[in-house]
Structure formats: C-alpha cells, structure tokens
C-alpha cells in the first residue's frame, strides 16, 4: 500500500469514527474466509460494517474522534465493527462470537464512553432503534384505539338492540 492509499484509508477511517455512534473491536485470528464473509453479510443486513485495517493506521485515524478510547485495544489481528445504530454492530458481533469462538470481542466505544467486553454484550441485549420506535408508536396508538372503542361501543350496543327488536317484531308478525 503506497503512501497516498494509506492517507486515503486514514481519512476514510477518521470520517467513519467521527460519524458512527458505536465501534466494536474484536480479534479475528483463526476465522476462515467463509466465516468473515458470513460476518460481513450479517453486519450488512443489520446496517453495520466490518473493517480490517492496520492497527497503526487505525490509531492515526482515531486521533481527534470521540471513540479514541479504543486505541489500547488495537493490538494483534483486530477487526472494527461499526454502525450508526448504537446496538446493531454489537448485536451481530456478540451473536457471531457465540456461534464462532474464534471471534473474541475485546471491547469498544459508544461515543466517548469506552466499553469492555461485558459492556458490549450488555449493549447487544438492548432493543435496536427501530424496535424502540415501534414500541413508542404502539404505546402512543394504544390509548387512541381504546378511546375509539369506548366512543363506538354505545352506538354498537344500540344497533344490536334495535336489530334484536326488529328480529323479534318479524318473528311476532310471522306467528
């Protein structure tokens, strides 16, 4: 990799570290190419990204970013998983690490907060941003639905009473 390519990579990584809300660092020693492809596809489906970069270049790219607290974790064969959703990368990384013991989560950073491996695992148990939005919408809609049911209930009861009265009148006429 020539000097210009390294500078481009550092600039790209710096932009990523500046804009993402979560970065997970893990050792990937022993993962096969098929395993890495599977991990990348799972991350992509969740809206996250996996990047393998030289630790030295990643250290340079971390300067001046909120997630600079992950610098001590960049030793050995490390990969960086990141996402704008604070939970997506952590969920996929933890789930993949459970299924494949060769992926070892070292820690991460959420904004300026450094996370140890247990912190990343705890973060992975939280619902995603989309799930939280769906719950909030459901909570907001539930009272409106109940109000509509309460308002419509007397009218429906009256309609049933009139219907039953009409049916009884028809049976009386037929008899």
UniProtKB/Swiss-Prot annotation:
This is Large ribosomal subunit protein uL10. One of its GO terms (cellular component) is large ribosomal subunit. Gene3D superfamilies: 3.30.70.1730, 6.10.250.290. The keyword Cytoplasm does not apply. PANTHER family: 39S RIBOSOMAL PROTEIN L10, MITOCHONDRIAL. Transmembrane segments: none annotated. GO terms for biological process: translation. It comes from the Bacteria. Keywords: Ribonucleoprotein, Ribosomal protein, RNA-binding, rRNA-binding. GO terms for molecular function: large ribosomal subunit rRNA binding; structural constituent of ribosome. It comes from Methylobacterium nodulans (strain LMG 21967 / CNCM I-2342 / ORS 2060). Belongs to the universal ribosomal protein uL10 family. The gene is rplJ. The keyword Ribonucleoprotein applies. The lineage of its organism: Bacteria, Pseudomonadati, Pseudomonadota, Alphaproteobacteria, Hyphomicrobiales. Forms part of the ribosomal stalk, playing a central role in the interaction of the ribosome with GTP-bound translation factors. Part of the ribosomal stalk of the 50S ribosomal subunit. The N-terminus interacts with L11 and the large rRNA to form the base of the stalk. The C-terminus forms an elongated spine to which L12 dimers bind in a sequential fashion forming a multimeric L10(L12)X complex. It holds the Pfam family Ribosomal_L10.
């Amino acid at each position: 990799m020539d000097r210009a390519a390294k500078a481009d990579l550092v600039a790209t990584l710096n932009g990523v570290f500046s804009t993402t809300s979560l970065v997970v660092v893990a050792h990937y020693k022993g993962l096969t190419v098929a395993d890495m492809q599977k991990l990348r596809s799972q991350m992509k489906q969740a809206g996250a990204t996996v990047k393998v970069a030289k630790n030295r270049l990643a250290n340079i790219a971390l300067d001046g970013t909120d997630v600079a607290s992950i610098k001590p974790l960049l030793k050995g064969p490390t990969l960086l998983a990141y996402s704008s959703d604070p939970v997506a990368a952590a969920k996929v990384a933890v789930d993949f690490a459970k299924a494949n013991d060769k992926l070892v989560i070292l820690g991460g950073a959420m904004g300026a907060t450094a996370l140890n491996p247990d912190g990343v695992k705890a973060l992975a148990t939280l619902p995603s941003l989309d799930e939280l939005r769906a719950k909030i919408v459901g909570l907001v809609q539930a009272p409106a639905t109940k109000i509509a049911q309460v308002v419509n209930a007397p009218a429906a009861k009256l309609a049933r009473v009139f219907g039953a009265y009409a049916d009884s009148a028809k049976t009386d006429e037929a008899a």
